[in-house]
Amino acid sequence: MIVDATLPLLLEYGEAVTSRQIADAAGIAEGTIFRAFSDKDEVIAAVVEKAMDTTALEEALAAIKLDQPFEKCLDAAIAAIQRRVVDIWQLMSSVGPRFHPEKAGPTPISPALTTLFETHRDRLGVKPADAAKFLRALTMSLTHPMLNDAPVSPREVAKLFLYGVHARSASC
């Protein structure tokens, strides 16, 4: 409850958010915050930790109806990944670097995204897990606000993923 109420406040006020604002948003007394957390920094750290959890993204990817055309599945998957990239970027931009998580290694491949590619294996020239890894990397790089001056639509990302930039089919 406290963590969920704090996220929109962090996006609006950053670390300058007050415990009073958090309490008001959560509908609790200010002292209640400090029975659950030792200080405001601990609340912010909990918000960041929850935001970094990939469960919501995995659920969104798993909810994609795999019986629809491959391109529609890709568009839906890309849109979900793009939302996550932007949401995480906004949060990380609103808090100081001391709240940025220390990551020990690469993020595991999404099981739901791999399943999407396994379902459409006949359209792939690579293993489903590799396709999942490549789509995630391409989507992230074309979505991150610091790497692009304008958003790239899910359809454009999907076209680039599927067909590349070559005008004719390549024979490498």
PLM features per residue range, with description:
Residues 59-63, 91-100:
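Short linear capping/connector segments at secondary-structure termini
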Residues 160-168:
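C-terminal alpha-helix
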Residues 94-96, 135-139, 161:
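Short alpha-helical scaffolding segments that buttress acidic/His motifs in well-ordered protein cores
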Residues 5-12, 58, 134-145:
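Solvent-exposed, amphipathic alpha-helical segments
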Residues 72, 76, 83-87, 97-125, ...:
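Amphipathic alpha-helical packing segments from all-alpha helical-bundle domains
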Residues 48-76:
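Amphipathic alpha-helical linker/stalk segments
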Residues 1, 5, 9-42, 46:
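Helix-turn-helix
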